Amino acid sequence: MATTVQEVAAVDTTIGQRILPADLLRWGSQNRRNLPWRDSRDPWAVLVAEVMLQQTRVDRVAERWPRFLIRFPNVASCASVPPAEVIAEWSGLGYNRRAVYLHRAAGVVMARHGGQIPTERAELEALPGIGPYTARAVRAFAHEVEAAVVDTNVARILARWTGRRLTAREAQNLADQSVPSGRVWSWNQTLLDLGALTCTARVPDCKRCPLADRCAWRGEGSDPARGSAGVSGGQTPFEGSDRQGRGRLVAALAGGPVTDGRLADAMGWPEDADRAHRVVGTLVADGLVVVCASGYALPGWESGT
């Protein structure tokens, strides 16, 4: 019989206490996605993967992550080059500001941590562009330190399992208390896989879910995941957006500086120079583009590649 919302709300309980860890871990071992970064415990490799996964589809990251690590196999190799080289390698993954932050983070790791990615969450979160989720993910997947990761998939599972909308703190507390001792890596990967494969956003496969007989929602009534903290909604259209123009310009600049006269064409808006200048201003503010004598360039490539 499914757990009622009242039963869940009445006690401070957790997935780990109410469901035998082996129950879910068995499903995880049989359904684990074959993702290349899961074979690595190298903190730098894991950090790169997690930064990429923040806002890029898993299949796209699986394609680009190995290539990025060939170019930048360790912290030192990333920190030692101009930002332009990291941005150029990142181009095509979207949200290119992440490349700037990753380059800055590599510099901080070299300067303050002797080139070693730190283990402590506070030190990880002090790195540029690294928030609580990414810090927890590095701890769990590289260092295998007791930590629970709550992305949109896990937040959705927790909301449905409890049958109610959760605040970010409630979701994180539930996840933190649920990690079986000594199984931090496999437990977190299993929850991520469950959310990606079975407890999906649009068409959850409740009949095949290993949590179905203990789930408060079980596909009946209003979905409690809607409106829960951490559960993402739909993205705004990419086609014709400022983001598309930003990406086009960064891709063009990977080949060298772009003159002011070519700016609008490079961004895909040949008839809208005002828009091009407005949007390039945001790229300059984000540290992705610099103004140079020949027009615009990636930082560090003002004189050409």
Give the role of each language-model region:
Residues 270-284:
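Short amphipathic alpha-helical interaction segments
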Residues 22-244, 252, 257, 266-273, ...:
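Catalytic cores of DNA base-excision repair glycosylases
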